[in-house]
């Protein structure tokens, strides 16, 4: 998605959340931040090449939820790094992939499939 559309969508999301609870930042702004965050989402392609995204450790709180949109047969480098920093709630993008497919299936058929066995089957075949 081109940057202008992403910026518009970020603004729309921000309008739904009280301003003192929401900060949307680009990677180039993260080193200026003097706080940690409750939710960190890696949507870069860094995990596809086994690299860490350029996110400073100082913004990753052990109580945060850390999400990587990539997925693999084991936790991505980013998720492993977050776990080493003490983060207990780490998730990859496999559930989102299956959830989006299930939602599409529901829109076409009116039937909402159980995603848990699908995620389990896919995870075991990675």
Where are the model-predicted features located?
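NAD(P)-binding Rossmann-fold cofactor-contacting core
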Residues: 1-18
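Short, charged, surface-exposed secondary-structure boundary motifs
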Residues: 7-11, 52, 100-103
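Generic secondary-structure transition motif, activating predominantly at the C-termini of alpha-helices
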Residues: 14, 45, 122-126
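Short, hinge-like loop/turn segments at secondary-structure boundaries
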Residues: 14-18, 43, 108-110
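Rossmann-like adenosine-cofactor binding region
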Residues: 19-90
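Adenosine-phosphate binding glycine-rich loop
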Residues: 69-126
């Amino acid at each position: 998605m081109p940057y202008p559309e992403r910026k518009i969508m970020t603004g729309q999301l921000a309008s739904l959340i009280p301003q003192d609870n929401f900060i949307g930042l680009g990677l180039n702004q993260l080193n200026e931040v003097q706080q940690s965050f409750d939710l960190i989402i890696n949507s870069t392609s860094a995990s596809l090449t086994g690299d860490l995204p350029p996110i400073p450790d100082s913004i990753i709180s052990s109580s945060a939820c850390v999400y990587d949109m990539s997925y693999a047969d084991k936790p991505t480098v980013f998720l492993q790094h977050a776990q080493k920093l003490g983060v207990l709630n780490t998730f990859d993008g496999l559930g989102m992939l299956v959830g989006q497919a299930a939602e599409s299936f529901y829109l076409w058929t009116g039937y909402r499939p159980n995603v848990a066995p699908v995620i389990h089957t896919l995870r075991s075949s990675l």
